[in-house]
């Protein structure tokens, strides 16, 4: 089902491919950036946190972290990894559209194309919830490659990639009337094939800024990379930094 595709997406070969992309080196580089954004020792909310790779690395560096994800498997994996590493953090199964906290966090992050999982009404539930969860002056970082200015210039009908022993083919269809990118992914390894459908709702930078501003989150900067290069048409990703007024 389109609205909840992500609940069952990260399984099997698909999950192995995601792990191959999310290397320890990438995680360290991303957390280097996040460490420069948030005050030392800040209480942070990572939503959705996936398998907790950023949540755990931030905790290792002294942040008080909480990770929330809709996947029970991811949360179980994250909690086990934290226990094994002796890292103190909190993980909860939950929906990013139904955050329960009020003025408890110094910062929050929505990393990795998650801002776009939903159509406008549900996306606004997340915005309202994360704004409520932040203290006044708290910061939000949104990152992903699906802002309109980033993804639309780069959409191809079909692409094939090889990652280690996995062949990954994507077939894209842009639904202009809905501003939605529909993608069929075919994942193949050792003769075994998995097919997944996924959808991302595409918002322009101006739309994202307005969505955040409607709940008191003022955009203070945008980047296209973790070395803070400016965001522009054709950039591979958007990193947006906002602050609660």
Residues covered by each model-derived region:
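Conserved class I S-adenosyl-L-methionine
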Residues: 1-48
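Class I SAM-dependent methyltransferase SAM/SAH-binding core
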Residues: 53-98
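Residues lining the SAM
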Residues: 111-113
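SAM-dependent methyltransferase
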Residues: 121, 141-211
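A short acidic, Gly/Pro-enriched loop at the edge of an enzyme's catalytic core
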Residues: 100-107
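A short glycine-rich, Lys/Arg-flanked "PGG" loop and its adjoining helix->strand segment in the class I
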Residues: 124-136
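C-terminal lobe and adjacent flexible extensions of AdoMet/dcAdoMet transferase-like proteins
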Residues: 205-245
């Amino acid at each position: 089902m389109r609205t909840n595709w992500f609940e069952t997406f990260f399984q099997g070969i698909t999950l192995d491919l995601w792990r191959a992309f999310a290397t320890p080196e990438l995680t360290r580089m991303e957390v280097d950036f996040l460490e420069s954004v948030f005050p030392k020792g800040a209480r942070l909310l990572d939503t959705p946190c996936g398998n907790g790779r950023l949540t755990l690395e931030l905790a290792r560096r002294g942040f008080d972290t909480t990770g929330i994800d809709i996947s029970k498997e991811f949360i179980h994996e994250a909690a086990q990894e934290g226990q094994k590493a002796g890292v103190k953090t909190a993980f909860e199964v939950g929906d990013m559209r139904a955050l329960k906290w009020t003025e408890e966090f110094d910062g929050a992050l929505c990393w990795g194309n998650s801002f776009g999982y939903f159509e406008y009404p549900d996306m606004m539930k997340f915005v309202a919830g994360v704004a409520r969860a932040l203290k006044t002056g708290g910061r939000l970082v949104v990152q992903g490659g699906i802002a309109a200015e980033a993804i639309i210039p780069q959409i191809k009908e079909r692409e094939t990639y090889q990652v280690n022993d996995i062949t990954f083919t994507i077939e894209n269809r842009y639904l202009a009337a809905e501003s939605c990118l529909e993608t069929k992914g075919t994942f193949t390894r050792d003769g075994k094939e998995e097919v997944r459908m996924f959808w991302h709702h595409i918002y322009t930078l101006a739309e994202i800024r307005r969505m955040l501003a409607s709940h008191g989150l003022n955009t203070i900067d945008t980047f296209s990379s973790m070395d803070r290069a400016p965001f522009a048409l054709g950039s591979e990703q958007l990193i947006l930094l906002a602050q609660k007024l």
